Amino acid sequence: MPRQKFGEERQYFESANDTKPMNKPSPMTILCEQTPVVILAGGKGTRLMPYTTALPKPLMPVGEYPILDILLRQLSKQGFRRITLAVGHLAGLIQAYFKQGQDWGVEIEYAYETTPLGTAGPIARLPRQERALLVLNGDLLTTMDFAKIVRFHYENRAVATIGTKRRTEPVQFGVIEAGPNGQITDYKEKPNLDYLVSMGIYVFAPTVREYIPRSQKFDFPDLVQRLLANQQRVVAYESEAYWMDIGRPDDYQQANEDFPKMEGIFLKTNVESAAVGTRI
């Protein structure tokens, strides 16, 4: 069977029908092992106060586990090994809990923020990488197969790939469309609004560092706007996996209701049901 090369990645990945010798690592396993991961774990979690006054948001419990514990278990089972935790608020508690990652089968390094750098800012201060970087918010509960978004990034030769989730919400009013002269062109009674939201899951090519200022606050929306202004390829990976950001009290409560029902799924690998990609 022919092999397909994924973007600038030098590894060749076998198709699903290829056979491989016993005990030989699969191409996806190699991809995960060679992909560095950054988890953003430095936020103050102001929307979850007063709980986050004494406990950093990544240590907030979901079921029997801190949310970041669940994420590290998933990454480890999927084959990712090199993890950097970007920490700030109550960083000592996070480091005391996870240490160097040996209990999770990963190697953890810590990047410390003395002043808030936003969501994208910490990337500029990391050592230069030769491979694409998987970046995750540290407060995610999801069943995404992270290897798939990394592979999608290479297949699409992107500079930045954003994990997205489709949301549909009803508009509570009748929606009118009108031209400049007031002429009504359409009237829809309480239509559904369909849109994509960011999952807080990203893959960035090494060159993305060139677009991030050092030592100042810089968020992912700022980075995407700068990339687009410079005609860089930014793509959306649309996922059907379960996803919840626990940053709001209602969502945190929902995550704690969902986790016991799906614990076996959350702590398994290759659990994502489907995903498609869309250019943005």
Regions found by a protein language model. Give the residues of each.
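Catalytic-core segments of class I nucleotidyltransferases/pyrophosphorylases
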Residues: 133-134, 141, 147-154, 167-170, ...
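A phosphate-binding catalytic loop at a beta-strand-loop-alpha-helix junction
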Residues: 34-51
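Aromatic (phenylalanine/tyrosine) cluster motif
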Residues: 6, 12-13
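Short acidic-glycine loop/turn motifs at beta-strand connectors
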Residues: 177-183
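Conserved N-terminal catalytic core of the sugar/cofactor nucleotidyltransferase
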Residues: 21-39, 61, 65-137, 143-148, ...
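A short, conserved acidic/glycine-rich loop-to-beta-strand motif
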Residues: 156-165
